[in-house]
């Protein structure tokens, strides 16, 4: 993803954080859960990460497997996780920075994780579950272009698959044809 796109999205997130009076925003990706929001705001596509964003810095924390990938995919400052689990890094950063109000995606964090790791940090945690989805509702130029390209691929794939439909063919067989054409013309499985 283009780093300029990430920078514009980050600026919009920071404006929202200021509007909601939060000092920082935390996003966790654990075993791929929430990876779509992480990719949207940082460009990073790994299965394990934490993002910590305040008014001056955007930090990506991930384990050593993703060091090279993270540096290529995201302009965020990189911390390689070594001696602590990701949520503990978040709690440590919040404590060190002294932020008073931190937004996090409560809908994506288990109650047990929150109680064990995040709550003890000396801050007021607020639900920021709607932050990224509210940004995603308004499409930027890159997203609009991707939607147009996907529609063109889907139309072409559908038309080509329709040409191969035969009496007695099952829906599963047609789906297989359509997906094959989508991949052939550059589409991805979503």
Which residues fall in each region the model found?
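N-terminal accessory/capping or targeting/presequence segment of soluble
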Residues: 1-95, 152
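Flexible, acidic/His-enriched mid-domain "rim/lid" segments that flank
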Residues: 4-10, 85-190
């Amino acid at each position: 993803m283009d780093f300029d796109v990430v920078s514009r999205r980050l600026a919009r997130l920071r404006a929202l954080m200021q509007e909601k009076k939060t000092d920082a925003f935390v996003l966790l990706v654990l075993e791929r859960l929430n990876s779509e929001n992480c990719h949207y705001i940082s460009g990073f596509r790994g299965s394990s990460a934490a993002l910590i964003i305040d008014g001056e810095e955007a930090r990506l924390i991930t384990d050593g497997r993703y060091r090279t990938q993270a540096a290529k995919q995201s302009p965020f400052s990189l911390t390689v996780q070594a001696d602590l689990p990701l949520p503990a890094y978040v709690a440590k950063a919040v404590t060190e920075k002294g932020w008073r109000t931190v937004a996090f995606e409560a809908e994506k964090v288990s109650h047990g994780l929150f109680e064990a790791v995040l709550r003890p940090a000396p801050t007021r945690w607020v639900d920021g579950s709607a932050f990224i989805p509210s940004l995603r509702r308004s499409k930027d130029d890159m997203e609009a272009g991707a939607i147009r390209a996907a529609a063109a691929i889907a139309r072409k794939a559908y038309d080509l698959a329709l040409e191969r439909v035969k009496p007695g063919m099952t829906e599963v067989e047609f789906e297989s044809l359509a997906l094959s054409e989508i991949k052939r013309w550059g589409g991805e499985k979503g």
